[in-house]
Amino acid sequence: MTEQKRPVLTLKRKTEGETPVRSRKTIINVTTPPKWKVKKQKLAEKAAREAELAAKKAQARQALSIYLNLPSLDEAVNTLKPWWPGLFDGDTPRLLACGIRDVLLEDVAHGNIPLSHKKLRRALKAITRSESYLCAMKAGACRYDTEGYVTEHISQEEEAYAAERLDKIRRQNRIKAELQAVLDEK
């Protein structure tokens, strides 16, 4: 039995291929940054976006503040209609005579009409600057007094002026809507 050589198991075996020998330590570059750094960057980006949005909203709020806060057309009509029904055709305002504000202020001063000058002025501005009022200003249309009687007719110059005003008001309304959209976004 001694003649037969049995294979002996060893723990250290020689590999058949050659392994490269390292002469130095290799440097491994990690491509992903640590989680804390990623979180910090995201928070910084979010804070920058929020600051930019806040600045944009503040600028929009400041730009929106230059426009008058007039009541709506319905509120203005409901303010004036109980005391001067001749100025309205149903719920739509008629074209007002020139100098009607002074006449209305005089009526408020002499009568028992509980309207302040400011409220009356704002209601008249809301009516005369409305799109429906300016669209109705065509050459030959009638202007009415407080009793509902015709006083004069619209001239060509007044019609041209109304068209300019209408363009300006539509442009302002478009700008206002854009600014309001900026304020409403989150």
From Swiss-Prot:
SUPFAM superfamilies: FinO-like. The keyword Transit peptide does not apply. One of its GO terms (molecular function) is RNA binding. Keywords: Conjugation, Plasmid, Repressor, RNA-binding, Transcription, Transcription regulation. InterPro entries: Fertility_inhibition_FinO_N, ProQ/FinO, ProQ/FinO_sf. It comes from the Bacteria. Residues 1-20 are annotated as: Disordered. It holds the Pfam family ProQ. Belongs to the FinO family. One of the components on the FinOP fertility inhibition complex, which inhibits the expression of traJ gene, which in turn regulates the expression of some 20 transfer genes. The transfer genes are responsible for the process, called conjugal transfer, in which DNA is transmitted from one bacterial host to another. RNA-binding that interacts with the traJ mRNA and its antisense RNA, finP, stabilizing finP against endonucleolytic degradation and facilitating sense-antisense RNA recognition. This is Fertility inhibition protein. It comes from Escherichia coli.
